[in-house]
């Protein structure tokens, strides 16, 4: 789950920077006023650019954000068990051995991230290692390995790129129309006023459309959680996965943020399930029992 939260946060930051750059390009070239095709090309480049940069940076940013320590050589029995378990599961699903890290946090969580199936990261909290049995922790690791095997981060990147492109294109197309309408009605405003109108309208619309698009992003995240749970059940047995989710119900809410949250084992609560990156634990447990 930590991995989705970080991905979305990074993507948002990149999108804000790209939005400012796009507005500067508009002010200098005026390409958006006369060419919808030019706007579409820029929307695709900048929309997918933000997602791809987020994906490429996800592994290093995730480690830095949680202060994770990569296990190079196991120093104790727990670290040895972690490496052996992840290695075995990675071989079972046919992916390269992920980098394994531990980060200090009281909440029971873990996350996976990385741009490629054969160059990924699995990080586990100290809270999870201290609070879960080995069987439960094994199920959590299987859940994260399943995320990697399913290529969820790649799919999320492609989907986010499409969403970003739509948000950029539609917000600027509407902003063009509004700025053109207001500048013709207020001739004394001049080019500076027209650009300010465009900048304000496009920024507000990007934020609004981006918020609405998050419903789609969160739906995808919830959908993939069920698949990762099912993948873990195939690797270690559904009873272990159910036991791990039952244990999570006793713990505190996840402290993971950004893209990391979406690909962690547990998510944050929200006023509405539509804005949750993870389905309620009860629904996940019921789905496993029905397998």
From Swiss-Prot:
Q: How many cofactors are bound and how?
A: Binds 1 zinc ion per subunit.
Q: Name one Pfam family in it.
A: Peptidase_M48
The entry lists its GO molecular-function terms as:
metalloendopeptidase activity; zinc ion binding
Name of the protein in its database record: Protease HtpX
InterPro entries named in the record: HtpX_protease, Pept_M48_protease_HtpX, Peptidase_M48
Q: Where in the cell is it found?
A: Cell inner membrane
Query: What Gene3D superfamilies is this protein classified in?
Result: Metalloproteases ('zincins'), catalytic domain
Signal sequence coordinates? none
Q: Recite the UniProt keywords alphabetically.
A: Cell inner membrane, Cell membrane, Hydrolase, Membrane, Metal-binding, Metalloprotease, Protease, Transmembrane, Transmembrane helix, Zinc
What organism, scientifically named, is this protein from?
Aliivibrio fischeri (strain ATCC 700601 / ES114) (Vibrio fischeri)
Active site: residue positions: 144
Instruction: Name the protein family.
Output: Belongs to the peptidase M48B family.
Gene Ontology BP, a term: proteolysis
Q: Which residues cross the membrane?
A: 4-24, 36-56, 151-171, 199-219
CDD domains per the UniProt record, alphabetical: M48B_HtpX_like (cd07335)
Residue numbers binding Zn(2+): 143, 147, 225
List its EC numbers: 3.4.24.-
What class does this enzyme belong to in the EC scheme? Answer: hydrolase
Q: What's the main place this protein lives?
A: membrane
């Amino acid at each position: 789950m930590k991995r989705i939260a970080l991905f979305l946060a990074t993507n948002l930051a990149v999108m804000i920077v790209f939005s400012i750059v796009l507005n500067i390009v508009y002010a200098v070239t005026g390409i958006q006023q006369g060419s919808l095709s030019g706007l579409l090309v820029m929307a695709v480049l900048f929309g997918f650019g933000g997602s791809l940069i987020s994906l490429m940076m996800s592994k290093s940013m995730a480690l830095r954000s949680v202060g994770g320590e990569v296990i190079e050589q196991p120093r104790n029995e727990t670290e040895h068990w972690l490496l052996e378990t992840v290695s075995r599961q990675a071989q079972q699903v046919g992916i390269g051995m992920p980098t394994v890290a531990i980060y200090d946090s009281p909440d029971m969580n873990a996350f996976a991230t990385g741009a490629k199936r054969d160059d990924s990261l699995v990080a586990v909290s100290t809270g999870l290692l201290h609070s879960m049995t080995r069987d439960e922790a094994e199920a959590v690791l299987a859940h994260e390995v399943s995320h990697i095997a399913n290529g969820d981060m790649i799919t999320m990147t492609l989907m986010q790129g499409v969403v970003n492109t739509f948000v950029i294109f539609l917000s600027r197309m509407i902003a063009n129309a509004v700025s053109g309408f207001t500048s013709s009605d207020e001739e004394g405003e001049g080019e500076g006023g027209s650009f300010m109108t465009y900048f304000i309208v496009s920024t507000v619309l990007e934020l609004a459309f981006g918020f609405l698009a998050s419903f789609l992003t969160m739906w995808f995240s919830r959908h993939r959680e069920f698949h990762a749970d099912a993948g873990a059940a195939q690797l270690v047995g559904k009873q272990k996965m159910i036991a791990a989710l039952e244990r999570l119900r006793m713990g505190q809410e996840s402290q993971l943020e950004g893209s990391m949250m979406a690909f962690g084992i547990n998510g944050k609560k929200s006023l509405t399930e539509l804005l949750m990156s993870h389905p309620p634990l009860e629904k996940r447990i019921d789905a496993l029992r029905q397998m």
